[in-house]
Structures are given as structure tokens and as C-alpha cells.
């Protein structure tokens, strides 16, 4: 420590002081204290040697304070102690709040089509436009079936007339579009929030006729009725330019056969027409009204009626004809390839419940839900007690462990002390669904719908092989809708009481007979969500009972987090998108060709080519606007009941949405008297199935409603996949049947052991539903009692009214791809198209590059001798010659002449 008083005097090192309190001891100087080795410090300089460790008080006067010694080495950490024993598991923490529901996944596969809605009234017939100038021939529509000749009015906007406008060659039929997804029949109601598709319920009594919707997918094509007598042939109008395609007409019910036209005056007999290609299958719509016979020339013998062609683009809706008789059933065509997934259809009405699914794993226990009103005691004998599951393991102390799968319940031990609340554990996997408890009483039936006309009974066709499941079957014609019952006011829903912890569910009892379904009241406003109940394990679904008539769908219940109240209902949504289009559209109109000359005489129709194979499915277009409502057509006979689609597999259970407060209960309308069962019409010919769409991801399914009694059923729509069963809340004690009292607060949980199951008694007859009591007030939330053993399942009560449709579930995982459909029948070849307009001449091309020289030719023959040439120019001077050699000496010359005289001599 610092030096004591000793200060600088360096005493002999004292015995090592006891280590000073660890406190101020500076680093103990290195002096010999026990202190660990001094650091490098030499002797601490100034600091004297620590004296005896002085009294450890404050050190006396501090001598000069030594510099602190170097820090001693830190000792090693001690060994860790043993872990304590885990404490007891704390009491269950309050479950954390439920997470929010995630955003909806991608859209699920298209749900099954809803049932066919009532047929809307036919839209008003548009007036024919004035004859246009003859345009270039529009693309040829498919040749419709050869009907009675209509009036040859001016070619109005209706471009797709079967008879070609210009009497040119018959254009090839357009490729058949893929079958569209059937639109809703009639104006679609406002689509509820799309819940998972419910299991299609029984067909409800058809509602009133809605406005005409877009034309649905091909209905089942009926057999052609007998041809009326042929009217006079109309004169051929000038070809109009092709009008825009009208909105699809509503699918009417099949029309009755129209009256025969008057016989035209007999002209010379023309040659029999060539058999036309198949007409476009009508929607199961009403037949258009036959126009008056035109003045076409003398009628020839009627041509053979060709098979109906695949559907071309729909023309404007024709005037509805009187109702034809149902045709006999056709054969089932092979299934087409899968098409892409369609847009989800509007939710269909709930179908009959499917067979029970396997029991799922137990779900996590959620917060207790509100206590529901007491249901009637079930009538059936108690079921056998299920085997207890194994007990869960103890979690680590303190923290709540993740939730294990609930074990079997042991005999309850005495209650331990309540542990502190641990943080909420994560939810465990869902437990198996418990059995479904007995049904509550049904609401009173709604008022009777009007009775539909009975359809004629057609001969039943042979059933075709079932298509792969999942693809919705074709829709049959809708039965005649009864009027809607009056909506009662919605009662105020009390807030839900707290639910105790759920016990494991027992097995499902048998389904009782379904009572008649009343029409649904309007949905009440959405209440605020109650607390989330704990999810009990879902039990297996029972088998579906016979399908009852569907009530009008109630408002959708909340499915996801707390939702706001619903706003007012908006206008009718757009019609569902059309099905995938075939890739080849008909040729566009040719460019303008100048004014047309007067029309030529009508040629005989060319032979119909065979229909080409369907093109691949196009991408689904956006939904078109709803068509105008047509006038009300004559009500058609009820169409045949189609086969029920196969039950889809159940989707995984969705999380239960929080329970919103209930809307006010509406007063129930008086029950309608069910109309007599209509005679089932014969099945129409099944069109070529469209390509199979990719399998959509299964949506999370809503709960299955129970089927009501079977109404006048149209064919059931395809069955949607069943939704997952929601977890049952804890059941309250059974109240007396009839009107529900307010639920009392939950009593303390009972503790007895489960008794043995008694023998199974005979199932009691279903009681009649009592009137619906007012909703009780919210009870206080009881502490959750220990989970009791699963009691025997009660008998299934009478069918309750259909619940509101759930919100569209989250998108399920994509299902496996379905089996490949049967290849479609090969279509006929199309008719030869009109010759195209000649193209313009192209510009003259640039000169080509010079080619290589050709090989040398052989020598030519010798030519004739030439004429004499002109004289040439003088040649140039040649070079100097070589110098010659020296010549030899010549001969002596002759003597010379005499010389001149010499000068005179000297004197």
C-alpha cells in the first residue's frame, strides 16, 4: 500500500502486509508485499519501501505517495458454479399478443366458380347501326350454327355474323379463345372480400335475376334444337364494316324453342348448305329471340346443321329468343392442357362440407376467445374418450419454453404455486383439430323464394370421366332464382366473453340432416375484434351432409386482424377477367380499300374448314365492365345438375382472425317454402376443356359451413378447397336450447377426471332450430382452467344458417402440379382466308457489285481479209551505220594537167 509513515525511510521490508484491503492499496509496491510481482517498477522510486504495512488506516501521513505499483496480475476466474436446478416452470405467461396477420400472399388459385347466379335480364337490344360503307371484310367470325335465317338487316355493329359480309371467301374461323373463366352470371354481387373459397355449399335457391354480366365461359352446349322453318332469305345488305365487338351477352338460360318463322315463298331450291362449323356454344343463356324472317331468296333445303364451332369472340348480345328445349347430353370432351391460373373467381357459395380431414397437429393455444353463447346440448351420445396425448416436457426455469405439443393430460396434480409470469412463449405448432361440437340452433328459415319452373327432364347423359380435381366443372344453367327474403336489421353483437383454454376436441359426430337455409340477412357492421381465443386443436371434419340450399351469403366475418368497419357496399365490381385468350386473334381488318362497289351476288358458302386446335391459353385480360342489363328474357327451364366437383384437399389451417364484435343480428325473415325440385335437365355437351391452369396456391380456407337442404339445385360449382378448421373456443356450459341467455361468467375450472365414455346411443333426430336469441353481453374473462379431458362428441345439431363468408385466406403454398389433362380433340382445319391485298412494289434495289471476270473464251474463227490500209507515215531515221574498214589503195590516177609557167629567171 502506500508507504505508511515510514515514508521514505526504507525499513527492512516488513512482512508482507496483509494485502491491504483491496482498496486503496495502490498496487502494492513491489516491495516484498505479498503483492504480486511488481511490475517493472524498480523499487518504487520515491516511494519508500512500504514500511510495515502500517496500520492499514488511511495510511499515515502518506509519505510521499509512492507511485502505484504496477497492477498485479489478475487471478484466473474461479470455476463456474453448478447450474442451479431449473426452477419449476412458471405459470403459463399470458400469451403474447397475437401477431398481426401477414399480408395476404399472392392470389390463390382461382377458387371454384361460384354457383351460377341467377340469370340477369337480357340487356336491351341495341338498334342496328346504319349500314357502314363496305369495309374491308372483317375477320371472319366462326360460322355460327346454321339457324333460321335472320333478317339480313344492315350489317350493324354486329361484326361477327356467321354469314360473311362480303361474299368473298369465307374467312377462317378465329382461333377459339380459351375458355374464359366463367364470369359471374348476372351482375356479380359485390364481391365479398375474397375469403378462402368456402367449400361450395349446396346450390341456394337462385336469387333474383341480376343484371346481365359478361358472358361467362362456355356453358355446356345444349344440343341444337330443331331448326325452325326457314324464312325468306333476306337480301344481302351491304357488308358493314366490322362493328366493335359487343360486350359479352349474359349467359341466359337455354331459350325455349322459338316459334317457327313463316314459310318464305319458295324460291328455286338452292344447294344444301355446307355443314357449318360448330357454332359458338351459347352461354347457358337464354336463346336470342328469333328475328323475323328476312327476305332472303327462296329458301333452299336446310343445310345439315354443322357441329357447333368453338366459341368465337362473343358478338353483341342477340335478342333473347324463346326458350329452347334442353338438348340431350353430349359426350364429355377430353380435358385440355392446364391453363395458367385464372384469377380467383368470386367466392362460390359454400359447398357441402367435405369428408373430414385428418386431424391436424394441435395448434398453439391462443388467447382465450370470448365465450360464445351457450349452444344447445348436442343430441348424440357421448363419443368415446380420446387417448390422452403425452405430457409436455418441463421448460427451463423462468423462461417459458416454446410451446410443446400438448401432452396427454395426466391426472391433475395439486396445483403448484403460481410462478411468475414468464414472457409469453412462442406458440407451438397447431394441435390436431378437436371434434366439432354440436351445432347451435339454426336461424329461422327465410321467406320462400318463388317457385322456379320445373325444367324438362332430359335423358341423363353418361357421366364423363371426372377431370382432375381442382378444375372447376362447367357450370350448369342456373335454376330460377327465388326472390330474396327481406333482410332483417342486424342485431348488435355483444362483445365476446373471454374464452377458457380449449380442451382437445373429440371426434366429429355424424352430420345431422340439414335444415332449410334461410336467405342471409345483410351483414352487420363489423364489430371491433375481441380477444383472441386460444386455439384448440382442430378435429377432423365430418362427412358432408347433403347439400342444402344456400342462403344468401352473409357478410363476411373478420378473418384477419381487426378490421375497420365495412364501408358501404360499392357498385357492382367489374366482371371477372376473361379466360386466357387463344394466341391467334382473327385477322384485323384490312386497310381501307376505297369505296366498295355494289355488293356482288352472294356466293355459296364455302365449305367449313375443320376447327383448328385450340391455341394456348392467353394471359387473362383485365375484367371488362359489366354489360348493360338486358330486358328480362323468358325464364329458361332449369338446367341439369352437374356432378359435384371432387372435394379439394383442405388447406392448412389459417390463423383464426381475431373475432370482431358481432354486428347486430338482423331479424330473420320468414322461412321460405322450398320450391319443388325442378326436373333435372339433361347435361349439355361438355365443351373441350380449356387448358388446365397451373395449380394455384391453395388459399387458406375458411371454415366449412354446413350444407343446408338441397334446393332446386343447379349443377354444383366446383368444390373449392376446404378451409382449415378454426380452433374452437372453450365451450361454455350448454344453455337451454331456444333463445340464448346472456352467457354467465366462466366458473372456476373443474378438476374431475374424465369419466369413461358411455355406450353410444342412437342419434336423436335433429331438433328444430329455436329462434336466435339476442347476443349476450360479454362475460368477464375467467382464468383459464386446466384443460379438461375431451368429452364425447355431441351429435351434430341441425344445420345452422350459413355463416358469413370468411375473408380471403392467405395464399397457400403452391400445390403440386395436377396431372396432365387429356389432349383436346384436334380441331378442324380453318376455312381458307380471303386473299390478302397485294403489297406495293418495293423500290428498285441498288446495283450489285461487279462480279469477277469470266474465264477466257476460245479463239474465234479467222476473220476475212482487211481492206487496204492507208499509206503510213514516214518512218523515223535509223541509226548511223558502223564505220567501214580501211579500203585498199586505188589505182594510179591519170596524169595531171600541165602546170603553169614558172616565173621568169633572173636576168
Swiss-Prot record:
Biased composition (Low complexity): 101-130, 155-169, 206-221, 272-281, 292-307, 340-362, 424-441, 453-475, 495-507, 535-555, 566-581, 601-611, 664-691, 706-745, 756-766, 783-804
Record field: compositional bias (Basic and acidic residues): 19-33, 808-819
Biased composition (Pro residues): 892-907
Pfam family name, one: Collagen
Tissue specificity field: Forms the fibrils of tendon, ligaments and bones. In bones, the fibrils are mineralized with calcium hydroxyapatite.
Positions of region (Disordered): 1-183, 199-907
Function comment: Type I collagen is a member of group I collagen (fibrillar forming collagen).
Protein name listed in UniProt: Collagen alpha-2(I) chain
Gene from which the chain derives: COL1A2
